[in-house]
Amino acid sequence: MRPSGRAADALRSISLTRHYTRHAEGSVLCAFGDTKVLCTASVLAKVPPHKKGSGEGWVTAEYGMLPRATHTRSDREAARGKQTGRTQEIQRLIGRAMRSVFDLAALGEYTVHLDCDVLQADGGTRTAAITGAFVAAHDAVSTMLRDGLIAASPIRDHVAAVSVGMVDGVPVLDLDYAEDSSCDTDMNVVMTGSGGFVEVQGTAEGAPFSRADLDAMTRLAEAGIARLVQHQREALGLA
């Protein structure tokens, strides 16, 4: 039995609350159980230097955790004067995930800048950030269409993410902190709505995992992401 009482293939309770803040072109509070991430999408009328004059836009992300998002307080990275390697890794992952489903030429020379701030962490913050950031980005694009900044949506597909792992030899979906801190294998999977893999990050924390374990975990992730995409569609009124 999992600590939460969930079945091995069960997601936590998922919610995607749109228009959570007032000023951003897109904002979503994404909750995976007790993990809560505020995802905002801002439209900027500029692009990074490597895109200037190309006619293409850019999608990028920043990620951070509030000081008391975890069991004990941690200093703000701004107070320490630099980002941790973990923060840099996660925000690059979010950016790659979003760009995988954007047609940058259709975006024009605009940047969609995503800010993902963890309000409360109970495992799976990066997967919640990706899943919520897509909905925020979708709302930002809708704002651009409404305001006549672009002629057609640059979004080609949905993208979402979930964690999977091996706990006592059993593949489980959407690990919370208790499972994440004690599992033998921890894996994060990012996929598109059409079933394409964007990223697979897997590490054996204890016993090495077999090819059969890998296949079982990716199948579990695929099924979980299909359900997350359905949550996105329902939140956006597309279901």
Swiss-Prot record:
<dbReference type="GO" id="GO:0000049">
    <property type="term" value="F:tRNA binding"/>
</dbReference>
<dbReference type="Pfam" id="PF03725">
    <property type="entry name" value="RNase_PH_C"/>
</dbReference>
<dbReference type="InterPro" id="IPR001247">
    <property type="entry name" value="ExoRNase_PH_dom1"/>
</dbReference>
<dbReference type="InterPro" id="IPR002381">
    <property type="entry name" value="RNase_PH_bac-type"/>
</dbReference>
<dbReference type="InterPro" id="IPR027408">
    <property type="entry name" value="PNPase/RNase_PH_dom_sf"/>
</dbReference>
<keyword id="KW-0808">Transferase</keyword>
<keyword id="KW-0820">tRNA-binding</keyword>
<keyword id="KW-0698">rRNA processing</keyword>
<dbReference type="InterPro" id="IPR018336">
    <property type="entry name" value="RNase_PH_CS"/>
</dbReference>
<dbReference type="GO" id="GO:0008033">
    <property type="term" value="P:tRNA processing"/>
</dbReference>
<feature type="binding site">
    <location>
        <position position="86"/>
    </location>
    <ligand>
        <name>phosphate</name>
    </ligand>
</feature>
<dbReference type="GO" id="GO:0016075">
    <property type="term" value="P:rRNA catabolic process"/>
</dbReference>
<keyword id="KW-0548">Nucleotidyltransferase</keyword>
<dbReference type="InterPro" id="IPR050080">
    <property type="entry name" value="RNase_PH"/>
</dbReference>
<comment type="subunit">
    <text>Homohexameric ring arranged as a trimer of dimers.</text>
</comment>
<keyword id="KW-0819">tRNA processing</keyword>
<dbReference type="InterPro" id="IPR036345">
    <property type="entry name" value="ExoRNase_PH_dom2_sf"/>
</dbReference>
<keyword id="KW-0694">RNA-binding</keyword>
<dbReference type="GO" id="GO:0000175">
    <property type="term" value="F:3'-5'-RNA exonuclease activity"/>
</dbReference>
<dbReference type="Pfam" id="PF01138">
    <property type="entry name" value="RNase_PH"/>
</dbReference>
<comment type="similarity">
    <text>Belongs to the RNase PH family.</text>
</comment>
<comment type="function">
    <text>Phosphorolytic 3'-5' exoribonuclease that plays an important role in tRNA 3'-end maturation. Removes nucleotide residues following the 3'-CCA terminus of tRNAs; can also add nucleotides to the ends of RNA molecules by using nucleoside diphosphates as substrates, but this may not be physiologically important. Probably plays a role in initiation of 16S rRNA degradation (leading to ribosome degradation) during starvation.</text>
</comment>
<dbReference type="GO" id="GO:0006364">
    <property type="term" value="P:rRNA processing"/>
</dbReference>
<protein>
    <recommendedName>
        <fullName>Ribonuclease PH</fullName>
        <ecNumber>2.7.7.56</ecNumber>
    </recommendedName>
</protein>
<dbReference type="InterPro" id="IPR015847">
    <property type="entry name" value="ExoRNase_PH_dom2"/>
</dbReference>
<feature type="binding site">
    <location>
        <begin position="124"/>
        <end position="126"/>
    </location>
    <ligand>
        <name>phosphate</name>
    </ligand>
</feature>
<dbReference type="GO" id="GO:0009022">
    <property type="term" value="F:tRNA nucleotidyltransferase activity"/>
</dbReference>
<dbReference type="InterPro" id="IPR020568">
    <property type="entry name" value="Ribosomal_Su5_D2-typ_SF"/>
</dbReference>
